[in-house]
Amino acid sequence: MIDFGQIFQGSYASVLMAKAGADVIKIEPPHGEPLRQRAPPGRATTLPFAMLNANKRGITLNLKLPRGREMLFEMVRRADVLLENFGPGAMDALGVGWSVLHEINPRLIYATGTGYGISGPDRDNLAMDLTVQAASGIMSVTGFPDRPPVRAGITVADFMGGDMASLTGGPSITLPFLLPSSTSRADVVMNSLPASVTR
């Protein structure tokens, strides 16, 4: 599994896969994944980054350079799954979107986690756990009766998004492996944060 997961949603999906036995290769840009960058001065990483990237191998690739893309294409030839949770179109803009990768490996399962999906009127809106908690109504059932709504204590939309994408959810990464036609599997598995908390 090639893992471009970042922050919580993508990284949680791939760590669940790694803990279930998948060989996961975490790919970071040269400057590091955003969750790693939150480390205090003098530290190389954060505890959440370490927890969400356990059981994974890791490399850095610069997909803005031809050599970085060539290295990714070599990995894709042998991969079963590629997971990313960038904004819609980010992988296409780098020249490594689904249509390109599918040509290289027709059996590849391409899993994408976005804020609001890959189509529809809100696809280009950026999302984060807090805004999705508010928009989905989760915050209407948290907090205190005499005060404004309060966010849930954990990043529930992000973690539910990762769970939905990986092992237990509806359009999950594992589903194509379980189907009788799995010898010719190839699919785009899409999950959005609002769908994760309203299903």
Give residue ranges: language-model regions.
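Compositionally biased, low-complexity repeat tracts
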Residues: 28, 166, 182-183, 191
